[in-house]
């Protein structure tokens, strides 16, 4: 019986390789700016999520170093023991005030924040309605939760409306993303918020890719659509240039999560130095509008220079998908771009649907106009 696990592992790996969908990790020796270095070769990096360029900011690094000198390197315990310190409390308070919620609860990752909410909130007899293209963390939690999960067609308000009518007698949670990570498009949040209110359902929005980048002072997609969901997830690995996440909600829900969200209760709290640095990142997001302005300029340039390229999708975000179709063709293009010193990532099934493999280009405020032109020229020539 011990061999069953080995056989299962080998079979799964072989199937993935035979389908041309095997993934591998590459050691990046330098890579938190517009360029990265792999195996001694330098590339322009169009695969990261550091949209505002904060990950390489000297100002933010100094804030983290200041936090280390003040609070040490680790929290030493979970939040409900002795791991919750002044920097954590300050960051939660600042986030709640900025985004217009009663409270914020910190988590070590967006994945754990999403799963913690769904696992702790949903019970047998509840209905969970999710956009078909929601993140894997949300889908996995939904499938493993005791609730009945149904998926509505991507950004299809009409389909969501019909599902809400069928679940009107059960407690219902609707979950969508603000910006969809593989397509770079926005959710119709205003319409969805109206529907959930009309049907007495709760709305949860994962704004991992919108917070810091979109909206007034970087407040994200909910600000763009002038809504306040019941639960908002923000993450710190994209616009904030660091890592971690927070759940924003009303005070009663926050108290509930502090008691029953196991990812929060039973995990060592993020280092207080990290929370200190995140508070400074928040200040930079609020005050340094030039970063978002530059992203908009680069976005316009990218779309203009690829306007005749079939498969290049226009989006209002720094996520620019180029739909290729077959996974092997996407890999060929990505490899050809690497030969020219341009690092892009081929996104293949199961991350995206079959026959929709793509090159996922992401832009950063660290990029220059010349960087964008180098990429678009290569894509136009190779495509």
Curated annotation (Swiss-Prot):
The keyword Acetylation does not apply. Substrate binds at residues 23, 135, 351. Its cofactor is pyridoxal 5'-phosphate. GO terms for biological process: biotin biosynthetic process. Pyridoxal 5'-phosphate binds at residues 110-111, 181, 209, 235. GO terms for molecular function: 8-amino-7-oxononanoate synthase activity; pyridoxal phosphate binding. It catalyses: 6-carboxyhexanoyl-[ACP] + L-alanine + H(+) = (8S)-8-amino-7-oxononanoate + holo-[ACP] + CO2. The keyword Membrane does not apply. Its EC number is 2.3.1.47. SUPFAM superfamilies: PLP-dependent transferases. The modification N6-(pyridoxal phosphate)lysine is found at residue 238. Pathway: Cofactor biosynthesis; biotin biosynthesis. Keywords: Biotin biosynthesis, Pyridoxal phosphate, Transferase. Catalyzes the decarboxylative condensation of pimeloyl-[acyl-carrier protein] and L-alanine to produce 8-amino-7-oxononanoate (AON), [acyl-carrier protein], and carbon dioxide. Homodimer. Belongs to the class-II pyridoxal-phosphate-dependent aminotransferase family. BioF subfamily. This is 8-amino-7-oxononanoate synthase. It comes from Aliivibrio fischeri (strain MJ11) (Vibrio fischeri). The lineage of its organism: Bacteria, Pseudomonadati, Pseudomonadota, Gammaproteobacteria, Vibrionales.
């Amino acid at each position: 019986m011990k061999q069953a696990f080995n056989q299962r592992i080998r079979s799964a790996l072989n199937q993935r390789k035979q389908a041309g969908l095997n993934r591998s990790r590459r050691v990046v020796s330098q890579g938190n700016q517009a360029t990265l270095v792999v195996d001694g070769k330098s590339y322009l990096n169009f695969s990261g999520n550091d949209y505002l360029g904060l990950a390489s900011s000297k100002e933010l690094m100094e804030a983290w170093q200041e936090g280390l000198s003040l609070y040490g390197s680790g929290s030493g315990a979970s939040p409900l023991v002795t791991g919750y310190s002044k920097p954590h409390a300050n960051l939660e308070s600042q986030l709640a005030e900025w985004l217009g919620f009663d409270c914020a609860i910190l988590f070590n990752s967006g994945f754990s924040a999403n799963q913690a909410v769904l696992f702790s909130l949903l019970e047998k007899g509840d209905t969970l309605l999710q956009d078909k293209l929601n993140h894997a963390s949300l889908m996995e939690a939904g499938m493993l939760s005791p609730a009945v999960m149904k998926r509505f067609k991507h950004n299809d308000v009409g389909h969501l409306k019909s599902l809400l009518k069928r679940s009107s007698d059960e407690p219902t949670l609707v979950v969508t993303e603000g910006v969809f990570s593989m397509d770079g498009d926005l959710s119709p949040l205003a319409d969805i918020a109206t529907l959930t209110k009309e049907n007495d359902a709760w709305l949860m929005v994962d704004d991992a890719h919108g917070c810091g980048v979109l909206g007034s002072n970087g407040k994200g997609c909910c600000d763009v659509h002038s809504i306040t969901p019941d639960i908002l997830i923000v993450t710190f690995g994209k616009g904030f240039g660091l890592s971690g996440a927070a759940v924003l909600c009303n005070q009663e829900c926050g108290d509930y999560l502090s008691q029953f969200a196991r990812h929060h209760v039973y995990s060592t709290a993020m280092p207080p130095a990290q929370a200190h640095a995140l508070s400074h990142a928040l200040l930079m997001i609020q005050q340094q509008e030039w970063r978002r302005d530059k992203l908009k300029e680069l976005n316009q340039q990218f779309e203009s220079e690829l306007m005749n390229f079939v498969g290049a999708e226009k989006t209002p975000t720094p996520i620019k998908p180029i739909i290729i179709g077959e996974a092997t063709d996407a890999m060929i293009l990505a490899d050809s771009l690497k030969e020219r010193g341009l690092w892009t990532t081929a996104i293949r099934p199961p991350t995206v649907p079959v026959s929709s493999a793509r090159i996922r280009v992401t832009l950063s405020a660290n990029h220059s106009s010349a960087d964008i032109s180098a990429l678009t020229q290569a894509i136009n020539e190779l495509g």
